[in-house]
Amino acid sequence: MPVNKLMIQMGIPMILSMALQAVYNIVDSAFVGNMKTGSEAALNALTLVFPVQMLMVAVGIGTGVGTNALLARTLGQGNSKKAAKVAGNSLFLGVIIYVVCLLFGIFGVKAYISSQTTDAEVLEMGVSYLRICCVISFGIIFFSLFEKLLQATGRSLYSTIGQVVGAVVNIILDPIMIYGIGPVPEMGVKGAAYATVIGQIASAVLLLVFQIKLNKEFEHDVKYMKPDAGIIKEIYAIGLPAIIAQALMSIMVYVMNLIMKFNPSAQTAYGLFYKVQQFVLFLAFGLRDAITPIIAFAYGMRSKKRIQDGIKYGLIYTIALMILGIAITEIFPGAFATLFNAGQSRAYFISAMRVISLSFLFAGINVAYQGIYQAVNSGMESLVISLLRQLVIILPLAGIFSTFARNGQMGVALIWWAFPITEVIACLVGYVFLKRIRKNKVLK
């Protein structure tokens, strides 16, 4: 099948899957923002817990990305026994990841939330919500792994079905558990947390069934979960940059929360906008998850033409998606503010929408670059782009701009401009890396 058609066929389900993943957080915030009492504090609490939620997803998805690329390459080489070991070791890693999240949920959440706020109501809500999400995190972790196993064998439609089921369960349960309907008592933010984790578990269970029944290219057996240091090293050689890339997103949001601690309304507005931004950029992440196995498979076959087609169409489709995202966020910022019932944060939220959305085009291209790098074993280049986007440029710029905002010399909107500036610089560096990779790995 031609690469352009294959990318559409594989990409659409993945894009929908990633977009629906972002729906979990958007739906929670929308329902929480419309609570009768304490909605402002609740929205602020969800903003503060968001970095840890992203970190859990980052580790799960990053491990899955490494598994995805390695599994696709191994199957391309016709090695079904190693493919079974790759799948089994990914599940072993999932168990380890869950244990870490469980321990943090029991012992670490209060200290984490306390570092970002002194408001007792926000602290109580944040701790309650995050503890539930961490202690019952096995759903999101194993969903992320099963999703990538299905995607690696070209069955991305089934991973999307699982995501849809989880999203629907979450949306149905949110109003029931947050507001209290029928015999279910009103639980507020705790209800939002329970609705989220139940939706994640529903997705994971369904994908487990699909994995066992449909992925026949390799054997399924508990014996393949026995840890193999070589395979784990290969998984993380590919997946670690993806983990770091998304973990850096968590660090960035956490530090931005600290930077804007001087203005809780702006802090909340940034958290709300980030969920909208995540929805848009997850379109690029979804397409990246099609770009990576397509190019990785072609790289394993040594097909220069298919590698170059994968790069070309991956970038073209990403740019088209990001232009659509910019149009929606620039035209309808007020509608999103109303959805979240943003209250005192409304003006800050709209200004963030207007400015930061300008960065989407360059951010999407950077995400596509990273998918290309990972497919051809150029994980270091992917890591450098992540560091530039999420740490090296953005945080110093935001810190400097916040100094002017705190002093009253400029408005909070100045901080938002750090995002477009950062993405443009990272995109230029990414283009240099791409030219070098084409010369040394594709055309050589």
Regions found by a protein language model. Give the residues of each.
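N-terminal transmembrane alpha-helices
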Residues: 2-38, 51-66, 70, 95-102, ...
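Interfacial/gating helices of multi-pass transporter permease domains
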Residues: 9, 32-54, 121-125, 189-190, ...
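Transmembrane helical elements of multi-pass membrane transporters/channels
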Residues: 9-28, 132, 166, 199-203, ...
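Short alpha-helical transmembrane segments in multi-pass integral membrane proteins
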Residues: 1-11, 71-138, 184-240, 295-359, ...
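Helix-terminus/linker motif at the lipid-water interface of multi-pass membrane proteins
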Residues: 19, 23-44, 113-120, 176-187, ...
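Transmembrane alpha-helix boundary and packing residues in multipass membrane permease domains
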Residues: 14, 18, 30, 69, ...
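Small-residue-rich hydrophobic transmembrane alpha-helices
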Residues: 43-103, 140-159, 269-333, 363-377, ...
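Short runs within selected transmembrane alpha-helices of multi-pass transporters and secretion channels
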Residues: 64, 133-151, 159-167, 192-207, ...
